[in-house]
Amino acid sequence: MWTESVDLHCHSWHSDGLHSPTEMAERAFQSGVKVWSLTDHDTDTGWQEASDACEKLGMRFIPGVEITCEVELQSETKDPSSWHLLAYFPDGASQEFSDWLLSLKDARVPRMKLMLQALSEMGYDIPIEDVAKFAEGSLGRPHLARAMVEHGIVESVSEAFEKWIGNGAPAFRERPLPNVSEAVKMVHQSGGLTSLAHPYYYGIEIDVLVPTLLRLGVD
């Protein structure tokens, strides 16, 4: 989310971004940002590098993460496979939260293996190492899509999602996700604050979404 001097939603190559935390911090600084948060998907592995970069640049760093959660409300117009909860820790997160986050990150690996198995059964063999080399942290579908491009299965990342690994596509597989209330509880126990990422993405009317978020404990 952008204002003139604040950016609180940003990804690095520790999840589905293409650049290091240092590079992303430098880009933010060059754009006039003074307060910045790195919010990679389900991982905090980029925090230390991001914090060090911000200290050198004179920016304030707020540790953050984008937690993938179960869908809480069904939409008549869209079919997202998950909701994304942003969590921020101005005073840093606890070890308990980091351990919980690690369990979410680890759960991505079995799911990736199932998707690779599905592709293999359709005649497309991709070693998991060829996917993992694109990921410095959380292993996700964008990394699989890039591996599919490299293997010549598709011409672009968007084609990979549209034809093979997007929601409901032939090689798509679900993975266990926390519900929003559980994630909020873990964040609050560690002294953090929560917000729903890109609220218009889910296809829920705001006058329905906001009361639901309040009921679930989202800040």
Give the location of each predicted region.
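An N-terminally biased module of ancient metal coordination in phosphate/nucleic-acid-related enzymes
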Residues: 1-81, 163-166, 170, 178, ...
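A broadly tuned preference for mixed-charge, low-complexity surface segments
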Residues: 57-69, 93-101, 134
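Residue-level signal for threonine
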Residues: 12, 94, 140
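Alpha-helical scaffold segments that flank or form the walls of functional sites
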Residues: 23-35, 95-96, 102-118
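Active-site gating loops and adjacent loop-to-helix segments of metal-dependent hydrolytic enzymes
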Residues: 72-109, 146, 150-169
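Divalent metal-binding pocket/active-site signature
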Residues: 17-18, 109-117, 122-205
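Generic hydrophobic/packing signal
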Residues: 65, 89-91, 123
